[in-house]
Every structure is written in structure tokens, then in C-alpha cells.
Amino acid sequence: MESEGPPESESSEFFSQQEEENEEEEAQEPEETGPKNPLLQPALTGDVEGLQKIFEDPENPHHEQAMQLLLEEDIVGRNLLYAACMAGQSDVIRALAKYGVNLNEKTTRGYTLLHCAAAWGRLETLKALVELDVDIEALNFREERARDVAARYSQTECVEFLDWADARLTLKKYIAKVSLAVTDTEKGSGKLLKEDKNTILSACRAKNEWLETHTEASINELFEQRQQLEDIVTPIFTKMTTPCQVKSAKSVTSHDQKRSQDDTSN
């Protein structure tokens, strides 16, 4: 079962809806803001079918405003996706992602859905977001990644998962970097030998295939795969960038003259 949330309130930086209000406003009773958002209840309870009816059934009274209702923000810039994350409703996140919402949107202080799920210890929601390719390197106003927020709130399982996701991303990015470097050499003055080029591209393909077939690989295994690829490509690129020692015409002539003199003396 997932954690019930941060051990402390994020009051002034994340979860407070009265952030930076003056004393007079804080003392006032909250005003009625209109009818309750019809998406809220199904989002919090995991009623995916109910949400789909609103988004996909033209006869539903809220159909035309569905996206607007979903993206309505509170005072700190959170929409209903954040509520779903806090509630640990992973299936809701997956379902709503199909409607083209931006899963990397930030609050006024730079928190993403991933930061939110990490703070609340919603491991399954973190997994869903990572599967949906959210930016795991996004920073909040404290320059914290989601992993750092999870650590701050002692969400150990979330920290471990995000470390694993980071190791996987590191390998993916290195493969992409190497592949791009091969393409760039074709445009520049220093070109790879055909054999070397094929060796590198073949190694990159092999590592991508390994990633696809080893979805549960450990952090150590991911690091090992990167090291193996690095051991293949580094000597090749080093060889390509090392200048050849070509003899100048003057040195060749001088060498030939010396050799001729030696032959004469003999």
C-alpha cells in the first residue's frame, strides 16, 4: 500500500493554497467559487470510466468543457492531475494522458507531477509517470529534482525507483549521444572508417535492444552496459581525433640526401 503522504505539510512551498496572501485576505472567509468541478470526484476515486464518459461522450453535459475543467488551476498552479497524483490514482493519470495533457507542466514554484507523487510517496504513480516519459530531471524553485524531494520526505522506495529511472535514462542518453556523434563526423573533416562506424552503430543498436528486453535491469547492470559501450567507442573516437604524424617534404628530402651520402661513403 502506498504512503499516505509527506510526514509534514508542504505549507508555504507546495501544498498551501494561501501562499503569499496578506493578513487581511487570510482572515477573510473563503468565498464561494462556483459549482464543484465534476472531474474532481472521479479523479480522486479512480473512476476512469466516469472520466472517459465526460471526455468522450458528446451527450455528457460537461463534455465541451472537459479539458478546461481538467486544466483549471488553484492559486499555486495545480490542476486536477496533481490531485490524482496526491491520491495515488495511477490509472487516472494514464487515462488522462491520452487526451494530450502536458505531464511536465509546473506549478508557480516549479513543482511537476513527478515532484508531487514523490513527495506523497506514490510509487505506482511515479512508475506510471516515468512510463509516460515525463522529465525526471525537472527542477523546482529549490533546484530539486523529484528524487531530491522524495529524499527530503524520507520516501525511500521512491528514491530507489527514481535512482533506477535515472540510471536507465543515463544509458539511453549516452546511446543517443554516441549515435549523434557518428552522424556529426560524417559532416566534419574527420571521418570514421566504415568499419569503425559500423562497429559503433552496431553496439548502439545492441544496447537499445538490451534496454527493451531488460526492463527490470538493476542499476549496476545499467551502469555496466554503459561502461561496455564506452569501452567500445572511446578508442575509436580517440584514434579518429589523434593527428597522424606525416613527414614533411623537406624532412623526406633531407633523409634521402643523408642516405645517398652514406651509400657513397661505402
Swiss-Prot record:
Q: Where in the cell is it found?
A: Cytoplasm; Midbody, Midbody ring; Cleavage furrow
Asked if the keyword Transcription belongs to this entry, the reply reads no
Q: Which residues cross the membrane?
A: none
Which residue ranges does the record annotate as region Disordered?
Answer: 1-43
Q: Which PROSITE patterns does the entry link to?
A: ANK_REP_REGION (PS50297), ANK_REPEAT (PS50088)
| Keywords from the UniProt entry | ANK repeat, Cytoplasm, Repeat
Feature: compositional bias, Acidic residues: 1-11, 18-32
A Pfam family annotated for this chain is Ank_2
Q: What is its main location?
A: cytoplasm
InterPro entries tied to this protein: Ank_Repeat/CDKN_Inhibitor, Ankyrin_rpt, Ankyrin_rpt-contain_sf, HSP70_C_sf
Answer yes or no on keyword Cytoplasm.
yes
Annotated ANK repeats reside at 76-105, 109-138
GO CC entries? centrosome; cleavage furrow; cytoplasm; cytosol; Flemming body; midbody; plasma membrane
**Example GO biological process:** cell population proliferation
- The protein's superkingdom reads Eukaryota
Q: What does this protein do?
A: May play a role during cell division.
**Name of the protein in question:** Ankyrin repeat domain-containing protein 45
> Organism source for this protein?
Homo sapiens
